[in-house]
């Protein structure tokens, strides 16, 4: 049995794997993870300021519907 060195080829090299599909999948996962993170940040911001926004809107509506017409003499 002859060795690889006898044929002048040396140690066989490992072929480079096809990384195109793997890279595309990794980028897709990374993009989706960023979208989910942004959405969670937005949701938490809205939820934390929801009561304050509701109260401000309610007071503004009272001002526009009740107080301003009374001041105008309607």
Curated annotation (Swiss-Prot):
In the record, the note on similarity to other proteins reads:
Belongs to the MtrF family.
Question: Which HAMAP family has this protein been placed in?
Answer: MtrF
The name this protein carries in UniProt is: Tetrahydromethanopterin S-methyltransferase subunit F
Spell out where the chain crosses the membrane: 51-71
Q: Where, subcellularly, is it found?
A: Cell membrane
Top-rank taxon: Archaea
The gene for this chain is: mtrF
Function field: Part of a complex that catalyzes the formation of methyl-coenzyme M and tetrahydromethanopterin from coenzyme M and methyl-tetrahydromethanopterin. This is an energy-conserving, sodium-ion translocating step.
Q: Which InterPro entries match?
A: MeTrfase_F, MeTrfase_F_su
Q: Which UniProt keywords apply?
A: Cell membrane, Membrane, Methanogenesis, Methyltransferase, One-carbon metabolism, Transferase, Translocase, Transmembrane, Transmembrane helix
Subunit description: The complex is composed of 8 subunits; MtrA, MtrB, MtrC, MtrD, MtrE, MtrF, MtrG and MtrH.
State the GO CC annotations.
plasma membrane
